[in-house]
Amino acid sequence: MIVPWQQISPEALSNLIREFVLREGTDYGESEYSLEEKIAQVQQQLECGEAVVVFSELHETVDIQLKQKF
């Protein structure tokens, strides 16, 4: 189920984005980006609708996914 990111508290959203970018295997291409830059990129993807926050009822987890993959 897609959860509107605007309905998540700023602190929880920040923690979710941070967890997402810190995961091993998250690919940002050939360029090196700082943690702050990666966080800003994910925030921008959420704001423009390229990424979505997804809640799994089965696993009771929250994740960020590219909209095209969801």
Curated annotation (Swiss-Prot):
Annotated protein name in UniProt: UPF0270 protein VV3048
Pfam families in the cross-refs: UPF0270
InterPro entries xref list: UPF0270, YehU-like_sf
Coiled-coil region(s): none
Disulphide bridges: none
Species classification: Bacteria, Pseudomonadati, Pseudomonadota, Gammaproteobacteria, Vibrionales
Family as reported in the entry's similarity comment: Belongs to the UPF0270 family.
Transmembrane segments: none
